[in-house]
Amino acid sequence: MTENRKDLTLVFEQVSDAELWALAEFVKRATWSEFRANAVDDDEAYRISDGVAKLQKALEEAGYSPR
């Protein structure tokens, strides 16, 4: 995979409040073992982890921050 960085803005127009809370809970609970089990190698697992962390931060900034 080439390292071409692209900015992406996601707009959740048809996602319910309950679905966003569930997504926030999921990304909070997801662990390295899930990332690694679904990746072809450690490098991809780290990229998955980084992407999930960014999604979690965006959800937190939007008010979806489960304890």
Report the location of each language-model feature:
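Positively charged, low-complexity terminal tracts
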Residues: M1-R67
